[in-house]
A protein has these predicted regions:
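Short helix-capping/linker turns of helical repeat alpha-solenoids
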Residues: 62-63, 67, 75, 79, ...
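Terminal, low-structured helical/coil segments at or just beyond the last alpha-helical repeat
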Residues: 51-55, 293-294, 307-344
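Alpha-solenoid helical repeat scaffolds
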Residues: 85-88, 125, 160, 196, ...
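Hydrophobic face of amphipathic alpha-helices that form TPR/SEL1-like repeat modules
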Residues: 67-74, 86, 90, 102-109, ...
Length: 344
């Protein structure tokens, strides 16, 4: 799964064009990109047919009503060229929108073929014309990254249509549009409604965004209990930013019973996910022995992990400086430069 960008925005789904990174949501494609390859001889890459573009890739969800879908199964097994053949065949023969999206994903990422953003976009547009929410969302993300005001206005329309079609990622991004007030009028109450729609589908970033609105009383009545509940759910579905904030809430007893041990466990959970703030706070907990047994070497290791992500803490710098050379070496040995967290 591609890394999710922490904070207000989400990373585009696995096949989305790279220029739109700030406005999209995570998908479940594999992290490693296979080597680009030429298309099978049966498929002429980029050549349109009367039914639409000639190439396509698989969606990360199997088409409804097909159990199992051969193209999706091949995609999941890493047989990308086979998935492409099957998706293209079905898209051209039956006008199947899900197969079109799969084709677009493969072309956009270069799975099984050389990357072809133009052909990928053609497939997204063909699927969007059929009302496919994933295609509408991706096109919205592409347009939102444009400098053109007209394109951004169209992006809002695509997000809306995708959200109304059931895309939780689109609902989240539409909420951002109304929360920020840069593309559409700033309307926190409307933003909250779209975040709620995304949260109903357990979209992690929508849950977190809605929690912050309840925390601040922005567009909704201020409600620390509801904010904590939403943070808890966002944490459960993998949002490390929400887990970090939930840990702070639990440590302070805001909207939930104060529980330093639970807070320490939550900080550790987010720290292991690579969240620099959680790494810093967990280091402080270990250095003070509040909520977890005092462990200055572990505290130093977590501090160094956070510091590697440009999060400084003079107090913990002093802790590291106070260690013996042997202790510092032990702490440093637990932090590998390519790892998001100390190796325990």
């Amino acid at each position: 799964m591609p890394p999710r960008l922490p904070g207000r925005y989400m990373a585009l789904p696995a096949g989305a064009l790279l220029a739109c990174l700030a406005w999209a949501a995570p998908a479940s494609a594999a992290q490693g990109q296979p080597p680009a390859d030429t298309a099978p001889s049966a498929v002429k890459r980029g050549a349109p047919t009367p039914a639409g573009p000639r190439l396509g890739t698989s969606s990360t969800q199997a088409p409804s009503g097909l159990d199992p879908d051969p193209a999706f199964t091949a995609y999941q097994r890493g047989r990308y060229r086979t998935a492409l053949d099957l998706a293209v065949s079905r898209a051209n023969a039956q006008g199947d929108a899900v197969s079109m999206v799969l084709a677009a994903e493969l072309l956009s990422q270069g799975y099984g073929v050389r990357q072809d953003p133009t052909a990928a976009r053609q497939w997204y547009e063909a699927a969007a014309a059929k009302g496919n929410p994933d295609a509408l969302f991706t096109l919205g993300a592409i347009l939102m990254a444009s400098a053109s005001t007209a394109n951004k206005d169209q992006a809002v329309d695509f997000f809306r249509r995708a959200a109304e079609g059931g895309s939780a990622r689109a609902a989240y991004n539409l909420g951002l549009v109304y929360l920020q007030g840069e593309v559409a009028p700033k309307e926190p109450a409307i933003a909250a409604e779209w975040f709620k729609r995304g949260a109903e589908s357990d979209q992690p970033d929508a849950l977190y965004a809605l929690a912050t609105l309840y925390r601040d009383g922005n567009g909704v009545p201020q409600d620390a209990v509801e904010s904590a509940r939403l943070l808890q759910r966002a944490s459960e579905v993998g949002n490390d930013v929400a887990t970090t904030e939930l840990a702070i809430v639990v440590f302070n007893g805001t909207g939930v019973p104060k529980d330093e041990e639970r807070a320490a466990a939550l900080f550790r959970k987010a720290a292991l996910q690579g969240n620099a703030i959680a790494q810093n706070r967990y280091a402080r907990i270990l250095s003070a022995g509040r909520g977890a047994p005092k462990d200055v070497i572990a505290a130093a290791a977590w501090h160094l992990a956070a510091k590697a992500q440009k999060l400084d803490d003079p107090m913990l710098d002093k802790l590291v400086a106070s260690l013996t050379p042997e202790q510092r070496a032990q702490a440093q040995a637990r932090v590998k430069p390519w790892a998001p967290a100390p190796a325990y």
